[in-house]
Amino acid sequence: MSFRDLRNFTEMMRALGYPRHISMENLRTPNFGLVSEVLLWLVKRYEPQTDIPPDVDTEQDRVFFIKAIAQFMATKAHIKLNTKKLYQADGYAVKELLKITSVLYNAMKTKGMEGSEIVEEDVNKFKFDLGSKIADLKAARQLASEITSKGASLYDLLGMEVELREMRTEAIARPLEINETEKVMRIAIKEILTQVQKTKDLLNNVASDEANLEAKIEKRKLELERNRKRLETLQSVRPCFMDEYEKTEEELQKQYDIYLEKFQNLTYLEQQLEEHHRMEQERFEEAKNTLCLIQNKLKEEEKRLLKSGSNDDSDVDIQEDDESDSELEERRLPKPRTAMEVLMQGRPGKRIVGTMQGGDSDDNEDSEESEIDMEDDDEDEDDDLEDESISLSPTKPNRRVRKPEPLDESDNDF
């Protein structure tokens, strides 16, 4: 739909003489009443005597109206219309209406109003109602086929007329014999009487057959009633095996309930087992990772202790000789304990491979017996360093930590 189509349609309808004013806003929304009036008026312009019902109240009437208009325009004006767009009765229907109005408008422009009136008068001379003539057309076709068949049979009979004429002439010319005529009449009467007797016998047989059928029907009814009563009796009587059947059914139901319960328990336990295996696998992986971390930290701590031990030995050589034994002991003894405390604080709650008890016990003894002998303290300190080096590297027992020689020299100084 476009503004140009709406404008052309309104101008063409005004030029064709449509009595009602059509605004361009009328067809922007669905307006089936206006579209039906325009279609009926355009059809009247083509064929004033056409008979199309104008009822558009119900949906069925509107569909029939649109189909009739489309059929008329296709047969009369050879214009193919889109019934779906016409039924929408909005801007899309304007394009379909323009197909009709453009033909009328062009005819009016070429020949003028007078020429168009003359053409309409000429067309009215040969008007016909297609809807009312369809039945006549079917009847004419049937009569034409009958005429053909009857004409063929009549032609055959006329071909036999020569022989039949001679036979007819001989029969008419031959005199009638009373005795022979009576004989023929009697034979015919006997045949008729025989047929009548046969018909009476058939009627009697029909009556007897009817009686027999009624008797059979009555007998069947009695049997049906007797069987129905027997069925009711059987239904009212409880079978002897019904108690056992019900008991067996209850037992089966109990067994089925037990089976369901056990099956559910089995399924639950299998699920728990799978969960347990999964958790064990996770724990194993976690322990493995933890062990790797501990080993790495122990290696780092071992390296750090070696570096710190070498640094401490160099510091002892630089110190002056007038330092007291107590000050030297306070610098040297807490260093291994500090390294072990750092290691224990790094992995709280985890199991350490190896033993750390030797160093701790020796430190305690050194703290208690620090006033007895300085040389014993130095020897205990050497033992502590060896024990700590062994405990820090449990995975590599063949690797030994070499004690730095400056420590012995520093001890000898004292």
From Swiss-Prot:
Q: How does it assemble?
A: Interacts with CLU/clusterin. Interacts with UBXN10; the interaction is direct.
Acidic residues biased stretches:
312-328, 360-389
| Gene Ontology biological process terms in this record | cilium assembly
Q: What's the source species' lineage?
A: Eukaryota, Metazoa, Chordata, Craniata, Vertebrata
Stretches assigned to coiled coil: 198-291
For the region Disordered, give the residue spans: 305-414
Q: What is this protein called?
A: Clusterin-associated protein 1
Q: Phosphoserine: which positions carry it?
A: S314, S324, S326, S410
Family named by the database record: Belongs to the CLUAP1 family.
Which keywords, in A-to-Z order, does the entry hold? Answer: Cell projection, Cilium, Cilium biogenesis/degradation, Coiled coil, Nucleus, Phosphoprotein
Q: Where in the cell is it found?
A: Cell projection, Cilium; Nucleus
A single Gene Ontology CC annotation of this entry is:
cilium
Q: What does this protein do?
A: Required for cilia biogenesis. Appears to function within the multiple intraflagellar transport complex B (IFT-B). Key regulator of hedgehog signaling.
> What Pfam families does the entry give?
Cluap1
